[in-house]
Amino acid sequence: FDYEQMSGRAGRPQYDNTGYSYLIAKSMEEAIDLEERYVNGDVEPTNSKLIENKDAVFKQIIAQVASTLAKTPEDLQDFFRKTFYGYQMTSNPSMSFFAEDSLKFEIESALEFLLQNRIIQATPEGLKTTPFGNLIAKSNYSVETAVKIKEYATNAEHIDPNELIYHLAQTPDLPLISFKGRKSKDPVREKLASSGLFALDIGNPEATTVSLIEWINERNEYEIENAYNVYSSSTRRAAYEASLLIKFTKNTMEVLGKYNFSKDLDFLSARLYYGVKEDIIPLVVGVKRLGRKRARNIVDIFGEDLRPYSEEQLQKIEGIGPKLAKSIKQFADNY
């Protein structure tokens, strides 16, 4: 099947009459095997995994309701009957007997979950998505992640960056940073404790949490890796995804009517994106390509108010040339 998918892309539609795909063999014997298996062989049976993937079912139901294509459970059942899964269930003699009841049960279970979590609501006009449901429909996040974030948003009385990062590290949408083999996990446990976080088990979510806490406190990947015995090469990616999840958290809170945390969440999102402490956020955001290292040097040497200093003085800092000094000066004068 993979070979058919690949070779089917040979040639450019509307430009080429013929397309060519090649299978490279290391020997004549292998070439014969490849031809027999991939070129002349039958495509292996394909089975739908839709119902096995709970999140896919949730997302399909949300999409159908949000687009007003389905207003009742019966509409949803009719939609799923027309999917590849529905076709396989009804066409298979061994499954067709209980296919209808099985499909109905799965949809009703998923719908009950979505109703309980206020993602979908029942109205006199039929099923409708809530504002939170619309937010999920427009995002790429799993329903599990969205529900976890909503739970946090509902209960939050203030924003603790460390606590929120740990909460996000336990969702399926944040890429995790892993430990190096069987090295000691004690440094991670100790850092969590000093950050006001308690964990019974220390695993990749905890390693990710500690790495991101250190990242927003301006430690680099090398320092994080050596301090906590983790593979820190994916820190930047995890931090970027976490910054986007913080924005989703902000949107979720605003949907719930909690606007008083918006500024704090904007700052935390920026800290994760740039890997900085709060005091240099305006500088790294306001001056393109400055970076956190040079921004920190500037603030450490000149302070946060840069208006009294000339471009020539700024250029004395390593890595800052005339062009960048001009941008910094313009930012300082207009901030």
Give each language-model segment a name:
Residues F1-R37:
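Conserved segment of the helicase C-terminal RecA-like domain
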Residues D2-M6, N17-Y20, N53, T72, ...:
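Helical mechanochemical/support elements of P-loop NTPase systems and associated helical scaffolds
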Residues G41, T46-I136:
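Long, largely alpha-helical accessory region at the distal end of helicase-like NTP-driven motors
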Residues E108-N117, Q121-R292:
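C-terminal helical accessory/scaffold domains
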Residues I281-D300, E311-K329:
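Helix-hairpin-helix
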